[in-house]
Amino acid sequence: MLVTTKEMFEKSMKENYAIGAFNVNNMEIIQAIVDAAAEEKSPVILQASSSAIKYARINYLMKMVEAATEEHPEIPVA
């Protein structure tokens, strides 16, 4: 499920845990990160650098992230 980082941080600060943030630039990396987060039952932050956005294009990255959240709706993703 897509959530805001504000929601994520509020919960993590109350429950005293960290959230991993990972740079993404293609489908395989997004799949691997979200699959690992699902395996660990952990929220995750996906981020893209300006060069990754230029390389992969923001619309493609957004659709790939949406697909990953549909595959793992139980995992909070920002």
Where are these regions (language model features)?
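Active-site cofactor/substrate anionic-group-binding motifs, chiefly glycine-
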Residues: 39-78
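N-terminal amphipathic alpha-helix/helix-capping segment at the start of soluble metabolic enzymes
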Residues: 1-20
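Short, compositionally biased "basic patch" segments
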Residues: 1-6, 36-39, 65
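Short, well-ordered alpha-helical microsegments
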Residues: 29-31
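Conserved, mostly hydrophobic/aromatic
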Residues: 23, 33
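A short linear-motif detector with a strong N-terminal bias
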Residues: 1-2, 24, 58
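Active-site beta-loop-alpha junctions enriched in small/polar residues
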Residues: 24-27, 49-51
